[in-house]
């Protein structure tokens, strides 16, 4: 939502294609010369893979930064995008219920690749299964409170009551905050794999697989057997 409203408030133009297509993306990059673009992690990977097919457009791009906000971005993709386009990649966390939870600041402020930045408004905390807030470097559910949090789900009081508890929106995401308030996402509660009583995060498996030079993409998920 903020990708649409903020530029309008600043008097800027917006290019919003109906569907994502690589060719259209690079054509728009050349035609409209945007100063930034926002996309999900899968789109960023596709853009990076195709950049070599559009060398002139990439060389003459007008970007000031690249924004990513739908999930944790592979560090290799971050390095690739920054090397290819010559601008910083700014990661953040947002969702329909809370449009912008956190974001890494623009340079020269401190940016921590692998994190989704610091809270922009309200409160972002980590909570355990008992509803207790945890301190820095402790893993738990990411919860958010503030004016940017939605009021509830339309005609679904049960879902609203489950998501909003004592003013805190329970995101369903697992994460931790460091000593400086930078947030790292480690997975989703519902995606935890229970193997012999041990809780395994799919993200950890995916990160390990992605360390291999022959692996381009990886996805881990539970499978009954």
Annotated model-derived regions:
Residues 37, 146, 151-152, 162, ...:
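AMP-binding/adenylate-forming catalytic core of the ANL superfamily
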Residues 9-12, 26, 34-39, 48-111, ...:
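Gly/Ser/Thr-rich phosphate-binding loop
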Residues 12-32, 41-45, 200-205:
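ATP-dependent adenylate-forming carboxylate-activation enzymes
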Residues 128-132, 139, 166, 179-180, ...:
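Residue-level recognition of short loop/turn positions
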Residues 100, 118-121, 132-163, 198-200:
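Conserved ATP/PPi-binding loop(s) of AMP-dependent carboxylate-activating enzymes
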Residues 70, 94, 117, 146, ...:
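Active-site glycine-centered loops adjacent to acidic/histidine catalytic or metal-binding residues
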